[in-house]
Amino acid sequence: VNDLFPLSPRFDLVLRGDMKMFFWRFLGAERLPEPSRRKLGVVALLYFIQGSPVAILWEVLPVYLRLQGVSLAAIGGLRLLELPYSLKVFWSPLVHRYGDRRWWIVGCMAGIAIAVGLLPLIDAAQLGWLLLVLLLVLTTLSATQDVAIDSYTVGLVARAEEGAANGVRASAYRVALVAMGGGSVFLAAVLPWNWLFVLAATVFGALAFSALAAPRLELPGQAREHWLAGFTQWIGSWRAVPLVLFVLTYKLGEFAIGPMVKPFWVDQGRSVFEIGLVPTTFGIVLSVAGALAGGGFISRYGIFRGVLVLGLLQAVSNLGYAFVAWFDLGRLGLYGASVFESFSGGLGTAAFLAFLMNVCDKEHATVQYAFLSSVFSLTGRLIGAISGIGAQRVGYGNYFALTFVLSLPAFALLPWVKSWIHDEPKRTGHASVS
């Protein structure tokens, strides 16, 4: 732009400063001190790292395996190898007790890089035990890395920074899905698959050591040794029952509708190009914008209002697809439903992640957060597995309406869950790092 319409250096600096301030205001971080804003960069890096292996598992491998002649049933069955994401709580104490969490991230990501680099050396068409073991290693390392990243982030981010941090966190994760997932599939059109996996492995290796750019966070020795007491005191009372039920049910509607969105587009007669452009690419962009906006909302109005208001918006958005199915609203109606669902999905995700972070004790976050994330991820895998049966039996419109109803029980639990929320953000202060 400067080449066509030259700007004075002073005006250029003012323009850049205004854009930067707009971004901070959008996040609700305009009053945060500079050290707090630097933490947001660390959070963005870590969650880009966290989302990268998932992009290979969800976006790249299904395409690769299908091109190798693997059946749809077998590809679907491979989702069972993702169970480590739901079981990671059982080995999270190891991450909590031993070593620097940054080095856990480095080690896991380096192992993931090796696993991805080995993929083209195995005959995927046979779907033999060697490939299954390699994929299980990949998912286990990815799940373990999640434990380290989530724990580190809870310790890094102060209460006043949680809204903005979770907006950045959800957005960076989605950007990784686009860059490493969609980008890899795009490159597969011009590169051989073995080169593509080697390139991805190289990127993963670089990302592994980039984690050391994050500041070192020390856990007190007493917190490391007494992790079990910290967990049982936190969860071992009757007031924990509403918390667990809330985590189980808050994203039920999202988990139920997700697997059926793309098949619905197909059955509406939309082209592959439209599906790739609108609900996939544009949808992820909108979810990133929604996550950032959700972080700004939470920074201003607090986590309780966030999970209530933003969660309800996310639930209501499922009805958009129901109306399209019931009343045959055509292409524009379908596009509108997609825009609403994608943006509000980002809003609800930012609120939920902020809630999970807030209810954990910072000194015992490794096990506590791993427990909560295991609970809701298990719910997602179970409800997703039967979503096709539900849509087939009652029809798309009724099923999408049912996903809205499934979202509602969580909100009835909010009066009991509210007591778990720590001091609401006041947009001041920051955690100490060394």
Model-inferred region functions:
Residues 22-37, 216-244:
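Juxtamembrane intracellular "pre-TM" segments in multi-pass secondary transporters
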Residues 30-82, 241-246, 250, 254-264:
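Helix-loop boundary and gating motifs at the non-cytosolic
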Residues 84-88, 278-299, 310, 317:
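Transmembrane alpha-helices of Major Facilitator/SLC transporters
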Residues 87-100, 289-303, 391-392:
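Helix-to-loop junctions at the C-terminal end of transmembrane segments
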Residues 97-109, 300-312:
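Cytoplasmic membrane-interface "Motif A"-like loop-to-helix N-cap segments
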Residues 106, 110-125, 313-329:
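C-terminal ends and interior cores of transmembrane alpha-helices
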Residues 113, 195-212, 400-416:
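Symmetry-related core transmembrane helices of the 12-TM Major Facilitator Superfamily/SLC fold
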Residues 305-352:
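C-terminal transmembrane helical hairpin of 12-TM major facilitator-type secondary transporters
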